[in-house]
C-alpha cells in the first residue's frame, strides 16, 4: 500500500510559486501512466521555455563567448541528468501521480520522469502567470549552475566527449541504434544502444526523443570507460 501524497501546497512552497489554477500543477505532476490528462504537453512547453531562459542568461553573462560554447553550457545546465538532480532535490517523486506499473517499478525515482516533471512545472507556471514570472523562477532554481559555469570543454555534451575520448584512444567512433520505441508518435519513449569497439555489451539509454536517448547512452559509455581507464 502506497503512502498518501503530501498536499500540492507543500510543493508550491518548494518551487517558490503559488498557483491560481491548481489544476495546472496537478496536471504537471501526473504521469501518462496515471491519466489521459497527463503532463507531456506541459513538458513540451516547459522544455522550450527553459532553453530560452537559460540561453538568454548565458548570452548576457558571457558577451564575448562564441555560439558553440554557449550551446554547450546551455546543454550542460538543461540536460536530463541536471533536471533530474533538481527534481530529486525538490522531492518531486513524493508528489507524482503514477500508474500502478510505474509505481511498482520505482518510477518516482526514475531520472527521466523527474526531469520531465521539472519541465512540466515550468510549462504550468508559465501558463498560470507570464514570461517574467517564470523567468525569475527558473533563474532562482538554476542560480548555482549559472554562477559556477564557465566556457570550456567540460561543457561539451556526452556524445561529443565520448567521440573525443575514443579518438584520443585511437578507436573507431561509437555507433548508435534505436532498439525500441514505445508510445504514440507524439509522446514516444526511445531506447538507444551505443556500441563501442572492444566492449561486448552495448550501453543503453532512454529518453523522450532519439537525441536524449543517445545522450543518455553516451553518458553510460563515458562513465564505464572513465572508470576502467
Curated annotation (Swiss-Prot):
One biological process term in Gene Ontology: tRNA processing
Record's subcellular location: Cytoplasm
Top-level taxon in the UniProt lineage: Bacteria
UniProt: Mg(2+) binding residues: 43, 116, 119
Pfam families: dsrm (PF00035), Ribonucleas_3_3 (PF14622)
Listed EC numbers: 3.1.26.3
DRBM domain span: 157-227
Reactions this protein catalyses: Endonucleolytic cleavage to 5'-phosphomonoester
InterPro entries given in the database record: dsRBD_dom, RNase_III, RNase_III_dom, RNase_III_sf
N-terminal signal peptide: none
A single GO cellular-component term on record: cytoplasm
GO molecular function, one term: metal ion binding
Active site location: 47, 119
Cofactors demanded by this protein: Mg(2+)
Residue span of region Disordered: 201-229
Domain RNase III: 8-130
Keyword annotations of the record: Cytoplasm, Endonuclease, Hydrolase, Magnesium, Metal-binding, mRNA processing, Nuclease, RNA-binding, rRNA processing, rRNA-binding, tRNA processing
Assembly notes: Homodimer.
Family note: Belongs to the ribonuclease III family.
NCBIfam families on file: RNaseIII
Role description: Digests double-stranded RNA. Involved in the processing of primary rRNA transcript to yield the immediate precursors to the large and small rRNAs (23S and 16S). Processes some mRNAs, and tRNAs when they are encoded in the rRNA operon. Processes pre-crRNA and tracrRNA of type II CRISPR loci if present in the organism.
Protein name per Swiss-Prot or TrEMBL: Ribonuclease 3
Organism: Idiomarina loihiensis (strain ATCC BAA-735 / DSM 15497 / L2-TR)
Lineage, top ranks: Bacteria, Pseudomonadati, Pseudomonadota, Gammaproteobacteria, Alteromonadales
Gene name of this polypeptide: rnc
Amino acid at each position: 500500500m502506497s503512502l498518501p501524497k503530501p498536499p500540492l501546497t507543500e510543493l508550491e512552497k518548494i518551487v517558490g510559486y503559488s498557483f491560481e489554477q491548481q489544476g495546472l500543477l496537478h496536471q504537471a505532476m501526473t504521469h501518462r501512466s496515471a491519466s489521459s490528462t497527463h503532463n507531456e504537453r506541459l513538458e513540451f512547453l516547459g522544455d522550450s521555455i527553459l532553453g530560452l531562459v537559460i540561453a538568454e542568461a548565458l548570452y548576457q553573462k558571457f558577451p564575448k563567448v562564441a555560439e558553440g560554447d554557449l550551446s554547450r553550457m546551455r546543454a550542460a545546465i538543461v540536460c536530463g541528468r541536471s533536471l533530474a538532480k533538481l527534481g530529486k532535490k525538490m522531492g518531486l517523486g513524493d508528489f507524482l501521480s503514477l500508474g500502478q506499473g510505474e509505481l511498482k517499478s520505482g518510477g518516482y525515482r526514475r531520472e527521466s520522469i523527474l526531469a520531465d516533471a521539472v519541465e512540466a512545472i515550468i510549462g504550468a507556471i508559465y501558463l498560470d502567470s507570464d514570461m517574467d514570472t517564470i523567468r525569475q523562477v527558473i533563474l532562482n532554481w538554476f542560480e548555482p549552475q549559472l554562477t559556477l559555469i564557465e566556457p570550456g570543454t567540460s561543457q561539451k555534451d556526452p556524445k561529443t566527449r565520448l567521440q573525443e575520448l575514443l579518438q584520443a584512444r585511437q578507436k573507431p567512433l561509437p555507433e548508435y541504434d534505436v532498439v525500441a520505441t514505445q508510445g504514440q508518435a507524439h509522446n514516444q519513449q526511445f531506447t538507444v544502444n551505443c556500441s563501442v569497439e572492444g566492449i561486448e555489451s552495448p550501453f543503453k539509454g532512454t529518453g523522450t526523443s532519439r537525441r536524449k536517448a543517445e545522450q543518455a547512452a553516451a553518458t553510460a559509455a563515458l562513465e564505464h570507460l572513465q572508470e576502467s581507464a
